[in-house]
């Protein structure tokens, strides 16, 4: 079953001409009954059984997991956590090297163009999750898409690692051409991203923008540690704020959490007790406390559960929008 599901979400890559090609989409065929079951899901309340039996039948948006500047711990363990929770591995895989993590030493403009490339072909905007400097890159991508660093962004083919020499795509939801500029990322999460490293690394252009989240994010969650010398926090954490319509949340992590080891969450999905807690978690609602003698280390439980809640929510929303848009345009989901 797992192999069949993974095969169902493989990408059909279509070459695009200078003016943009018709989106090829994912090689996924859903019957009408399955589509109706997906459309009936409540994105804010997806149970483990609904994810396993219904949502897993749908294609999943790509997730770009951006690691920190010193990858003593990459984002691969966090990606493995999401795979263990039920997210398709292919949607987390870096096409450049087949790994489950992305370097944060990347041109954010190129990454913005890559998101557009995927959206045009798959009909679903990727999500961004960044740790430390990776979080800065995720926020920089949002500002790139908002036009803060230029008035156009070229489409970038991640498989060829080359530009397509165009700054417009064919929007798969409307069939019309549109610029890359202004595309909206459905969900962005950043972990322990601070201003001190921006100073030390000479990333001056992001100092004034690091805590400002533009409209190019639909939903953004910033996770911070109050005591985090690496990020430059000494007893308090600066908050992120929307400069438009983005829905922005700030989450302070427990003192037991560590800047470097925040991506280490896989064991939380493998332990029955912590997995059940994560599956019941919903931001702002009471969840029973776990005993401190629970087998896995609980330091990373809060952000793992919070991110997983948002990932499955936006997986559902993107899948539902894909179905609706293709029905409207009378294009089979294939």
Where are these predicted regions, by residue range?
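Bacterial N-terminal signal peptides that target proteins for export
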Residues: 1-9
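Hydrophobic/aromatic beta-strand patches that form the interior of the parallel beta-sheet core
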Residues: 64, 93-95, 189, 219-223, ...
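Serine-dependent carboxylesterase/thioesterase catalytic core
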Residues: 89, 107-220, 225-231
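C-terminal catalytic-base region of ester-bond hydrolases, centering on the histidine
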Residues: 199-334
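Short, highly selective alpha-helical patches that border small-molecule cofactor pockets
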Residues: 75-79, 138, 234
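N-terminal secretory targeting signals
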Residues: 22-26, 138
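Hydrophobic h-region of N-terminal signal peptides that target proteins for export
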Residues: 13-21
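Active-site catalytic motif of lipid deacylating hydrolases and related acyltransferases
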Residues: 25-126, 263, 287-288, 292-333
């Amino acid at each position: 079953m797992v192999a069949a599901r993974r095969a169902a979400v493989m990408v059909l890559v279509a070459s695009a001409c200078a003016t943009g090609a018709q989106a090829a989409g994912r090689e996924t065929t859903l019957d009408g009954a399955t589509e109706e079951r997906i459309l009936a899901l409540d994105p804010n309340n997806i149970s483990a059984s609904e994810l396993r039996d219904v949502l897993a039948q749908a294609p999943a948006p790509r997730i770009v997991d951006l690691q920190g500047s010193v990858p003593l711990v990459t984002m691969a363990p966090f990606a493995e956590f999401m795979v263990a929770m039920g997210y398709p591995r292919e949607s987390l895989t870096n096409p450049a090297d087949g790994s489950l993590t992305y370097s944060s030493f990347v041109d954010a403009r190129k990454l913005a163009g890559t998101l557009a490339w995927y959206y045009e072909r798959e009909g679903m905007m990727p999500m961004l999750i960044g740790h430390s400097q990776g979080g800065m890159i995720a926020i920089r991508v949002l500002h790139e898409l908002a036009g803060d660093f230029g008035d156009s962004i070229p489409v970038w083919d991640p498989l060829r690692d080359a530009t397509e020499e165009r700054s417009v795509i064919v929007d798969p939801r409307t069939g019309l051409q549109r610029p890359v500029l202004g595309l909206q990322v459905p969900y962005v999460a950043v972990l322990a991203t601070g201003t001190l490293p921006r100073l030390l690394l000479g990333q001056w252009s992001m100092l004034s923008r690091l805590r400002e989240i533009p409209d190019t994010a639909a939903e953004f969650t910033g996770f911070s540690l109050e005591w985090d010398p690496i990020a430059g926090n000494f007893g308090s954490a600066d908050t992120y704020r929307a400069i438009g319509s983005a829905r922005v949340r700030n989450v302070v992590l427990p003192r037991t959490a560590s800047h470097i080891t925040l991506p280490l969450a896989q064991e939380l999905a493998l332990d029955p007790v912590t997995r059940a807690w994560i599956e019941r978690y919903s931001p702002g609602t009471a969840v029973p406390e776990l005993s401190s003698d629970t087998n896995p280390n609980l330091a990373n439980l809060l952000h793992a559960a919070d991110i997983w809640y948002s990932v499955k929510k936006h997986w559902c929303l993107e899948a539902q929008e894909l179905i609706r848009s293709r029905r409207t345009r009378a294009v089979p989901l294939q």
